[in-house]
Amino acid sequence: MKKIFILFNVFNIAIFAQVLLPFFIINSAFSQYKGNVNKAESYLNKSELKTDIGEKRSLLIDAKGEIDLAMTIEKNNIKARSWYVQANIYSAIARQFLDIDPDAIEKATESYKSIGDKIKTNDVTLIQNANVGLQNLSSHFVNQAIFALQGSGEPNYEVAYEEFVNSLKIYPQDTLGLLYGGYVAEQLYKYDVALDFYAQLIKMNILSKKNTNTIYQNSINILFNHCNLFDECDSFEKSIKLISEGKNIFPENNYYPSIEINIAMRLNKVDDARNKIDNQLKADPTNASLHFNRAVLYYNLG
């Protein structure tokens, strides 16, 4: 009976260990941290002085660990300054070490935006600093994208695209990010993304005439040249809608009537194509492209 009792207790201890072990592991992850906001900020400040990437990384990991624990404590979580420190820490991680936390951009953005909104404060300077921090983080990604395109050697479209997308996580309606992000997406054959970015810009209707014309033409070209990707080849319905809008905004621009002719020819609408070509030639009798299209049309008719 004694042996059975011993075995029973050994069995219980084993189960007890299995139950408590995860708790000890999770708890030990925080054991080196005290949940002190000032200490978290101190780690961040030290990291900014380091030139060695390894040292900087290690300090930011500690800053993250300290602030993560601190923000679970109610007295810290209700203070705007705590959110500001958290935002700055995640902003620093987002700039160089996204592998530490892939959601660092979103966390920094949410923290900055919470100050003065979700987290009330009368500290106007702190609210202003939070806005500046948010703008600086966005500018960082935009500058990285531009450098990838224009820095040296061949443009790195992959890096540029990634950085523009990062900037749009902060300001989703940033016109620069949408405009150039759309252009870069085209270079990477991400036509659905490019169309989405351009559609947002068209809806916002705040670009210059030149850039508005560009996004209309780019959108139409994508739909026309890659109609199979967008279920367009049988009708070109989306293309025609954009062409109609473009013609209303830019009535003197020959691109829109010309692409209309190309669509009519693709759809084998012979009479429609002929009439459009003849009307365009009356307005622009020296247009070589129109004469070529007319010749092709009559050649195909036999």
Where are the regions that the model predicts?
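Bacterial Sec-dependent N-terminal signal peptides
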Residues: 1-37
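Amphipathic alpha-helical repeat scaffolds of TPR domains
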Residues: 32-49, 76-96, 122-152, 176, ...
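TPR-repeat structural position
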Residues: 53, 60, 105, 154-157, ...
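Structural motif corresponding to the intra-repeat A-B loop/turn of tetratricopeptide repeats
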Residues: 57, 93, 98, 102, ...
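Canonical positions in the second alpha-helix
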Residues: 70, 115, 167, 201, ...
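Structural marker of alpha-solenoid helical repeat scaffolds
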Residues: 73, 118, 170, 204-208, ...
